[in-house]
Design a protein with these regions (language model features):
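Hydrophobic alpha-helical transmembrane segments
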Residues: 1-179, 183, 191-331
Length: 331
């Protein structure tokens, strides 16, 4: 098996494992280790560099270098060590590393917990469930706010949890995929524009913006295509998805977050985003989409169906890409 075909095989098997297993609670996910490592380094960097603006900016660069470097060395080291024992063990380790980079089923499972609590009219339980998958303050959300938060998370993470990892795995295998995941984890932990992380997290946030630039836009166009495909009850509006994407794709502080959110809002014919509370402070945000109908809990299920459609199309494109590169390499 050539390197290209082996890469396609491990990525495809990892994708299929995620579809079946998701993120079982009994399996310790490497992202937790990365998160613990980031927290450990943050404390050390603050002590070593101090709390000045320039010091924290420099410390943020060091944080990025250490986290990405360590992630690359550890993931690459695992594959190298396994390869020394057996090619098949390396293959198995590669599949597992790729599998843990995807977040399709876990995203669906966690968002559907929100859906089920909303259907029971249990606002407190729904707030708690959505707090597990969003970074905003959830105690102030009403039923509509909880629903919107869940839909937005599914839409945004179609890129962060599927398209971007797949993009970097297709280029550099599981090691590059995990470097991306490390940057994305840093951004989710220290990439906030508040007093605590404005300077320390800037390097991580900027690098995350760069790494997600192409995948988020690729994912948005694939999601538009997915919205155009026939659906039961015509639940997706492909034409409106494209319209809202072209109009609202930059209605977010991040250059990438609104790319897929705008497509989802258009496809569902609802209005997402708007002002939100973070760490006890109200953050003013632009709306995404038109208020053509009220957001309802069923939109969480619809967003998940759009997530799955988009994910399978992306995997298909990856397979075609790797096969084409294999053919071209032999010409």
């Amino acid at each position: 098996m050539t390197d290209r075909l082996e890469l396609l095989a491990v990525v495809a098997l990892g994708f299929l494992l995620d579809q079946v297993l998701g993120d079982p609670h009994w399996l310790y996910h490497p992202v937790r280790l990365i998160g613990a490592y980031i927290s450990f380094l943050e404390k050390g960097i603050r002590k070593l560099f101090g709390e000045g603006e320039r010091a924290l900016l420099a410390g943020g660069v060091v944080l990025v270098i250490l986290v990405t470097g360590t992630t690359a060395v550890v993931s690459g080291g695992i594959l190298y060590a396994c390869g020394r024992i057996s090619p098949w063990l390396r293959f198995l380790a590669s599949v597992i590393l790729c599998y843990q980079l995807f977040a399709v089923k876990s995203l669906k499972d966690e968002s559907m917990k929100v859906y089920r609590e909303l259907k029971k009219d249990d606002l407190e339980a729904a707030r708690y469930a959505v707090s597990m998958i969003v970074g905003r303050d959830t105690k102030v959300l009403d039923m509509t706010g909880v629903t919107k938060a869940a839909v937005e998370t599914v839409a945004e993470n179609t890129s962060d949890g599927v398209a971007a990892p797949l993009f970097y795995m297709a280029i550099g295998g599981p090691v590059l995929g995990w470097v991306y995941k490390a940057v994305n984890t840093m951004d989710s932990m220290v990439g906030y524009k508040n007093d605590k992380y404005l300077y320390l997290g800037r390097a991580a946030a900027k690098l995350d913006d760069v790494l997600n630039f192409i995948p988020s836009r690729l994912c948005a166009w694939i999601m538009i295509f997915a919205a155009y495909l026939p659906s039961k009850g015509h639940e997706f509006d492909g034409k409106n998805a494209k319209k809202i994407f072209l109009r609202d794709r930059f209605n977010h502080a991040s250059p990438n977050s609104a790319q897929t959110e705008s497509v989802c809002a258009g496809a569902l014919r609802v209005r997402l985003a708007g002002d939100a509370w973070y760490f006890g402070k109200l953050v003013k945000k632009k709306y995404i989409g038109d208020d053509l109908r009220p957001v309802e809990p069923e939109d969480i299920r619809r967003a998940n169906r759009l997530l799955y459609r988009t994910s399978w199309i992306l995997m298909g494109i990856c397979a075609v890409w790797e096969a084409a590169m294999e053919i071209l390499s032999k010409l």
